[in-house]
């Protein structure tokens, strides 16, 4: 059964890459769904069939016919997913993109971070936690100011910051 599941997930990842969806959300587990749900619902209504919800948690799904749910597990399959995924906009709540095991790839046009807490970007995250994102959905001016300050002092590429 494990071998069968592995190949089923592998096949699903390759299907996503062939489709090259407009919007893809990655979730580590179902506890993160509440933070992106409204964005997902809005995009699914506006772009039916173009929104994918990918999770490492088999129980993490969105009950919306316009959202395509895919379980990808973790470990090797998660690594394979992130190195091969081809999508226009990839939404995540994972920090430290490109600084940890999750690396950017050339097939993603726009890496988008959305917060799962209304906290300062300088208090609980690593200093480079958001450096490699293209777009960040911020909770307020304080996050925008903190990110812009870091971009300036570290001479980083400017991100699109949305409040």
Annotate each PLM feature:
Residues 24-163:
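Active-site and donor-binding regions of nucleotide-sugar-utilizing enzymes
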Residues 1-29:
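Membrane-proximal basic amphipathic "stem/tether" segments
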């Amino acid at each position: 059964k494990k071998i069968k599941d592995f190949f089923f997930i592998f096949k699903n990842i390759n299907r996503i890459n062939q489709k090259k969806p407009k919007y893809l959300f990655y979730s580590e587990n179902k506890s993160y769904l509440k933070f992106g749900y409204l964005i997902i619902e809005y995009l699914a209504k506006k772009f039916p069939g173009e929104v994918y919800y990918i999770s490492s948690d088999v129980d993490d799904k969105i009950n919306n016919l316009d959202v395509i749910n895919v379980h990808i597990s973790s470990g090797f399959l998660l690594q394979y997913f992130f190195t091969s995924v081809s999508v226009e906009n990839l939404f995540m709540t994972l920090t430290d993109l490109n600084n940890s095991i999750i690396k950017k790839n050339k097939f993603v046009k726009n890496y988008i971070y959305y917060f799962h807490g209304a906290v300062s970007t300088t208090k609980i995250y690593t200093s480079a936690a958001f450096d490699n994102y293209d777009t960040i959905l911020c909770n307020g001016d304080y996050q925008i100011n903190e990110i812009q300050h870091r971009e300036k002092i570290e001479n980083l590429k400017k991100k699109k910051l949305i409040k």
